């Protein structure tokens, strides 16, 4: 094991360094007597440990900063009042202050250092060193990142360093021009991240995802917020993009296929690869019967977050009194059907965009042209039904660039261009799959959606007769094996087709209005014609 010298980072007086602890050591450290506050880990009936993260039960997007310097000023997709995103600029002197604050917090203490990889491809992976003072934070990154072999650990040289000072606060934040006492800051040039005053584990996971989203596309590698799977031979790769609630995890966890990963992937000349070594699943309302894979993954070495646990260790997955964003992290080998030994597979043949359309307009499946692929990828659309005060349910649209706007560091058109380049090279086809509602007022059944996914993966959809849907110019199949053909043209699900037309016009206008922000460069302007035409 490499000798870890923290003095080169300005961290001095360390009383003990626990370097890449075993799961046994982590369990002992996070459940031992004498821990206080959010350091405490509680053993549960399933063997997994549960921890609480305080007021931050999710990411803190208003407190995310990137240092603006010569390297980043012209490459990062900066937050602007006109087109807001999470990339707030930070001055170099403010960075020096917050980094110093984090280092001071970590001095003169027992520390945990976890060296791990982000990225399953050895050529482009990032070697990351996490320096934390809390045992369960070391456990979290041990679960979520790819663990080095003994030999790799011996010669480990980090490309990137993360300082987690969750116990510190930026007390003079107003003077520094920051949003609050909490700060999650990145320096792209020095390759460092600082976390202050938030205990949420996901800041470390999504922090590294954001950084992969910066470095990889600049090397010509597609970086994607998606799940991915392959057939039982580890071939016929499929990628599933989709925002929360669209079925990304459900549809990629398929008993007939092998999981590559559930959230973050790259696509280079060798194929598709996972960034992670674990999964971070939502567990609110988790049911053993409907999601057995996730339920069975919650055992010793898994780490629950913000779940309600009784004194006797009994878990209440229904309780959302702390947060709806209750989570579990576990190493990917807790899932049986996975691609082994490395979470990677050949170039994708099928790319699926999942949208849950609450407007009832989009077809259950559309075969996209390359231009439509870029347009709908940039749009990143889904919609949910939100109750209004009179009990009427109104659809609320969400447009999130590339189905992952919160984690994009470059202009969204860069991600779209890289994805299409890779698709053209592998001959991949893209599909827009609506897992939402239609004119019946009911959600499209999971049986029909699975039938559609099966037809895409088998290639049957390419042999099906098709027709065009007006306004959107979508090509849709008129029949597919195992799918109710009465739903394939959404107009057929309305008693009166003019009702679909009115809703379609409304949704088309929303797409067009949202897309204006991408027309600030030539790549974006060229795609307007691929969107809805009124």
From Swiss-Prot:
Record: residues binding ATP: 206, 225, 242-250, 291, 327, 443-444, 449
GO MF annotations, alphabetized: ATP binding; metal ion binding; phosphoenolpyruvate carboxykinase (ATP) activity
Pfam families attached to this UniProt entry: PEPCK_ATP
Cellular compartments per GO CC: cytosol
Binding site for substrate: 59, 200, 206, 327
Superkingdom classification of source: Bacteria
InterPro entries: PEP_carboxykinase_ATP, PEP_carboxykinase_C, PEP_carboxykinase_N, PEPCK_ATP_CS
Enzyme Commission designation: 4.1.1.49
Residues that bind Mn(2+): 206, 225, 263
Cellular localization per UniProt: Cytoplasm
Pathway noted in the entry: Carbohydrate biosynthesis; gluconeogenesis
Family named by the database record: Belongs to the phosphoenolpyruvate carboxykinase (ATP) family.
Family annotation (HAMAP family): PEPCK_ATP
Record-linked PANTHER family: PHOSPHOENOLPYRUVATE CARBOXYKINASE (ATP) (PTHR30031:SF0), PHOSPHOENOLPYRUVATE CARBOXYKINASE ATP (PTHR30031)
This protein's name: Phosphoenolpyruvate carboxykinase (ATP)
């Amino acid at each position: 094991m490499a000798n870890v010298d923290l003095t080169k980072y300005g961290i001095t007086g360390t009383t003990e360094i626990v370097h890449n602890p075993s799961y046994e050591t982590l369990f002992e450290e996070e459940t031992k007597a004498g821990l206080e506050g959010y350091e405490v880990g509680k053993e549960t009936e399933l063997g997994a440990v549960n921890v609480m993260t305080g007021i931050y039960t999710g990411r803190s997007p208003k407190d995310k900063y990137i240092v603006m310097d010569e390297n980043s000023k012209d490459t990062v997709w900066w937050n602007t009042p006109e087109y807001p995103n999470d990339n707030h600029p930070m001055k170099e002197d403010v960075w020096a202050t917050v980094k110093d604050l984090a280092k001071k917090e970590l001095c003169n203490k027992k520390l945990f250092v976890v060296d791990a990889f982000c990225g399953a491809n050895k050529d482009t992976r990032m070697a990351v060193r996490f320096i934390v003072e809390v045992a369960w934070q070391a456990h979290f990154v041990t679960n979520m990142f790819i663990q080095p072999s003994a030999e790799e650990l011996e010669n480990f040289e980090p490309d990137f360093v993360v300082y987690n000072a969750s116990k510190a606060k930026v007390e003079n934040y107003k003077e520094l021009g920051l949003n609050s006492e909490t700060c999650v800051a990145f320096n792209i040039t020095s390759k460092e991240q600082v976390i202050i005053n938030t205990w949420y584990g996901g800041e470390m996971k999504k922090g590294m995802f954001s950084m992969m989203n910066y470095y990889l596309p600049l090397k010509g590698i597609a970086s994607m917020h998606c799940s991915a799977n392959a057939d039982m031979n580890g071939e016929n790769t499929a990628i599933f993009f989709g925002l929360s609630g669209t079925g990304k995890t459900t549809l990629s966890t398929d008993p007939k296929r092998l999981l590559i990963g559930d959230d973050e992937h790259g696509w280079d000349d060798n194929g598709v690869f996972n960034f992670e070594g674990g999964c971070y699943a939502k567990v609110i309302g988790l049911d053993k019967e409907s999601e057995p894979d996730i339920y069975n993954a919650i055992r010793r070495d898994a780490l629950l977050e913000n779940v309600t646990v009784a004194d006797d260790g009994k878990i209440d997955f229904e309780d959302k009194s702390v947060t709806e964003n209750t989570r579990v992290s576990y190493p990917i080998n807790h899932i049986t059907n996975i691609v082994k030994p490395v979470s990677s597979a050949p170039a994708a043949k099928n790319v699926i965009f999942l949208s849950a359309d609450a407007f009832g307009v989009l077809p259950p499946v559309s075969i996209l042209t390359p231009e439509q692929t870029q347009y709908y990828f940039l749009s990143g659309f889904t919609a949910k039904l939100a109750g209004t005060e009179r009990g009427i349910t109104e659809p609320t649209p969400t447009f999130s660039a590339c189905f992952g706007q919160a984690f994009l560091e470059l202009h969204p058109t860069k991600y779209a261009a890289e994805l299409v380049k890779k698709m053209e090279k592998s001959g991949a086809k893209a599909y827009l799959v609506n897992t939402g509602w239609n004119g019946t007022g009911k959600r499209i059944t999971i049986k029909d959606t699975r039938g559609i996914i099966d037809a895409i993966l088998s290639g049957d959809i390419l042999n099906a007769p098709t027709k065009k849907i007006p306004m959107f110019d979508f090509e849709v199949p008129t029949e597919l094996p195992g799918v109710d053909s009465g739903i394939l043209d959404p107009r057929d699900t309305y008693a009166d087709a003019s009702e679909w037309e009115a809703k379609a016009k409304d949704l088309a206008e929303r797409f067009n209005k949202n897309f204006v922000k991408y027309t600030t460069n030539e790549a974006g302007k060229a795609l307007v014609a691929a969107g809805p035409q009124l």
